[in-house]
C-alpha cells in the first residue's frame, strides 16, 4: 500500500512539474528569486543551529491532510498554527506544501514568514526534478 501511494504521488508530481515548466520557464524563476532576495536580504537562521541551541529540539509540522488519514484540519490557518508553534517553544517548522496529497500550498511558507515567524522553515514537498529546487 505504502509503495503504491508513494508511486502515485511521484507520478502526479512529475505531471505537475511538467505543467509548471510550461507555464513558468526556469529563467523566470531565477529572476523572481533574485528580485525577492533583493527585497528581503535577511537570512533565516540555520535549522541545525536552532535545534542544537533550543531546549526542545522540536521541528513542528504544519500539515492539513495526509494520504493515509485524509483531512486533519481543512481550515487550519498557517499563520495561526505556525505562530502558536513558535510561541510554545518549537525550534523549527516543517510546512507541507504539496496541495493534492497534503492540502498544502507553496505560499504557506511565505505566509508563515510574513506573519512574524522567525524560526527556520523546512519547505516540505516531493522533489522529482531539479526545476523544483
State each model region's role:
Residues 14, 98, 126:
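Flexible loop residues that form catalytic
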